[in-house]
């Protein structure tokens, strides 16, 4: 069963974005189950309906500036590359070419692992991923909280170099919560956030977004 919510939050945020001169990227649907099974067809089918309805309902807003593909991965997965490419193409076709953003993560030690993925493996896998998705994705903003602090600048530099190779814009997603604490999750200490911003700057990244302002920084 489906129930109509009391308030249309997407409409509310778009109206506020219109008023304040901000850019709004619409996040697509994430089923979690379909695309994790390495069969993205159902995920794509559901999202095509979401994208078409979203553009029909909200595309008239001047602040509607692009799309965010919500499926987040850390390693090279060709099935997800197919989803990114095909769904991104659909978003562009429906909206007259508005840009498409993804925000993958680095398969680091803080992703419940004993050690981070090697820089060489990360580079090799994402080189292939970018070659497969470049027709459907305009911008990549890697999450910056999963690896050790001293590793971050090297990963970000590789990300930027690979993105530029395939004509994809590279941002950084500076996480505003702390993965080093026993409680999941406390707002990050400013010194740590500044360190990550400096690492992005050193890697040649010129634009940064954050997850999540409304939760951890408000």
How would you label these PLM feature ranges?
Residues 1-218:
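Glycan-processing catalytic domains of CAZymes
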